[in-house]
Design a protein with these regions (language model features):
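Flexible, solvent-exposed loop/hinge segments and secondary-structure transition points
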Residues: 20-161
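Bacterial N-terminal signal peptides
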Residues: 5-16
């Protein structure tokens, strides 16, 4: 009788499947409106400083959400801004930091699609990477980065939750 009682108590435990990894994941993502507000704020900051630039905002996977180009910004600025944003999100680092920590002519700088030039800045919400912004066309990457950071500052209240 005792063995039967023990078997009955153990049956539910033995029959329960082991917990597998979740089949789905969830992640934070910027809405199109928020990404557009970010890009517009960065563009406006550059315009205020007298710079003609292109601004790209990518999601956490590096896919372009918004692309804005000032009417006098060079056509090249579109590709470079997008590349800076893509690089920031894929390297999980601001591109200025990548420039500072990688020597010229190294493999990392030659990766297809990577634009290792200052002006790409990660966008984080509540400590989670949600995308990046890239700016190109100002006279120097430090100025591109300043405009990108001004864009992020404009939406900071929506990112800190």
């Amino acid at each position: 009788m005792r063995k039967l009682w023990l078997a009955l108590l153990m049956a539910p435990l033995l029959g329960a499947p082991a917990r597998a990894d979740d089949s789905f994941v969830t992640f934070k993502s910027m809405s199109p409106d928020l990404a557009l507000t970010l890009a517009r704020a960065a563009l406006a900051d550059c315009q205020k400083r007298g710079y003609q630039v292109a601004v790209a905002v990518v999601d956490r996977f590096g896919v372009t959400q918004v692309l804005l180009r000032d009417r006098y910004a060079g056509a090249f600025a579109i590709t470079i801004a997008t590349g800076k944003a893509w690089t920031a999100v894929n390297f999980r680092n601001n591109t200025g930091d990548v420039v500072a920590t990688t020597p010229p002519d190294t493999g990392v700088r030659a990766l297809p699609g990577a634009t290792v030039s200052t002006g790409g800045v990660m966008v984080e919400a509540g400590g989670t990477l949600v995308g990046a912004i890239g700016v190109s066309g100002a006279p120097g990457g430090d100025k591109d980065e300043a405009c990108a950071k001004a864009g992020i500052a404009a939406i900071r209240d929506k990112l800190d939750f």
